[in-house]
Design a protein with these regions (language model features):
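Single conserved hydrophobic/aromatic residue that forms the stacking wall/gate
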Residues: 184-192
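N-terminal beta1-alpha1 cap of cysteine-dependent amidohydrolase-like domains
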Residues: 7, 17, 21-23, 32-45
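N-terminal glycine-rich "phosphate-gripper" loop used for MgATP/nucleotide binding
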Residues: 35-80, 91-96
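Anionic group-transfer/hydrolysis microenvironments
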Residues: 35, 65, 142, 178-179, ...
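Short, surface-exposed coil-to-beta transition loops
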Residues: 74, 182-183
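Active-site nucleotide/adenylate-binding loops and adjacent lid/helix of ATP-dependent enzymes
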Residues: 3-20, 29, 49-55, 79-83, ...
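A residue-level signal for conserved active-site and pocket-lining positions in enzyme catalytic cores
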Residues: 22, 60, 186
Length: 192
């Protein structure tokens, strides 16, 4: 089977292991930087290229970074249109990065979750915050990952200030109630 691993860098551990495993199992495998791919979109003949060479794979394994979701998903979609089977679909990649959609779906199931506010925040920031509850608030960028773009605000004024600042960069913002928890620590041997 001809497999394309779509990654930014062969040196990434996960990419390297996928490549090694595929080769060990006898597959014709290539790592391709999806950021260097470009597409030809024409009637009934989707094509994709990298460095002037047309690409074709039986299967692709996407390793798309969160910061490149839109472009990476477009590359995966082009391979899908060409008949390649993808380990993660382009739609799945896009949906997995959409925090708002995930929260809307989870909220509709009855699963316990923090009260979340989302709005354009063009005028009435305080009303959106009040719809969530009382401070403290957790303010999140929709596009942030792994804790980036997350701010805990202790007061209403601090929350308004953070949102006003984020609005200046046209960021999409979620506001959530803060749920405190007590961390359990096991007794130390000295306490026995």
């Amino acid at each position: 089977m001809k497999i394309g691993i779509l990654s930014q860098d062969i040196r990434l551990y996960s990419t390297k292991r996928l490549y090694e495993t595929a080769v060990e199992r006898g597959h014709d495998t290539e790592v391709v930087s999806y950021l260097r791919c470009y597409m030809n979109i024409a009637k009934a003949k989707p094509r994709i290229f990298s460095a002037g060479r047309e690409l074709s794979f039986d299967s692709v394994i996407p390793r798309i970074a969160a910061t490149w979701t839109f472009y990476g998903a477009a590359v995966v979609r082009q391979f899908e249109l060409m008949g390649s089977v993808s380990a993660n679909s382009s739609a799945g990649i896009s949906r997995s990065r959409d925090k708002l959609r995930a929260l809307q779906l989870i909220g509709n199931t009855g699963v316990e979750m923090p009260v979340t506010g989302y709005g354009h925040f063009s005028r009435d920031v305080e009303s959106v915050l009040k719809s969530v509850g009382e401070p403290p608030f957790v303010i999140k960028l929709l596009e942030g990952t792994q804790g980036r773009g997350v701010v805990l605000t202790e007061t209403m004024d601090a929350a308004i200030s953070v949102i006003e600042t984020m609005k200046k960069i046209d960021a999409n913002i979620l506001v959530q109630e803060f749920i405190s928890c007590l961390l359990y620590t096991s007794p130390s041997p000295r306490d026995s």
